[in-house]
Amino acid sequence: MTTTVVPARAAWSSVVRAGETLTITDLHGNQAVDCLVYDAHDTSVRYSAPDTIHAQGGIFLTTGSVLLSNEHTPLMTVVADEVGRHDTVGGACSKESNTLRYGHHTWAQHACVDNFLAEGARHGLGKRDLVSNINWYMNVPVEKDGTLGIVDGLSAPGLTVSLRAERDVLVLVSNCPQINNPCNGFEPTAVEMTITGTTTSAATTTGAATTTTAAATSTGAGTA
């Protein structure tokens, strides 16, 4: 088992081997966790929001949801969810979207796209590899007219969501630094990432405060 506490505003990444389970714990409640998933052996195969949404007939993820790739193949399956629903359409905050929504004074604020680019670079990924992401714990209701809202989260301290890897996958996470809307309760906090399960090869994890009790390699601080 490998457990990593990811500080507020920080990034994290790990290879999760086929059959292993990744559990995300919202330690303090109301913390959005932006997430991207790639085939660990061919990163051109990556999470596809359109394929996933179309296959399950809905925009929210919960127990039983299968994260599909751009080749319509399964990457991970949500096997347990204590929250009830997670967002697929709200996207990742960026300097550009922050200035558009909240004013140019927010330009210097750290954003999820910064985290994804910095953490992705550890694995040879760049801007062209960023796709529409998952927002675990984020509450983005959609009105009948198609209007999206970013509102107070549904999570509470200690609630978890668990995903089983259906193949070897690379998971990138941005522990969302947003302070201009209520997706993090205006105060980003730490989350915990735990990988469990027995495989024949070791996982490679980058993050912070990592405790390893099985074959795994921890490198870097994982912050952007």
Regions found by a protein language model. Give the residues of each.
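Acidic, Ser/Thr/Pro
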Residues: 1-207, 224
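Extracellular mucin-like PTS domains
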Residues: 204-219
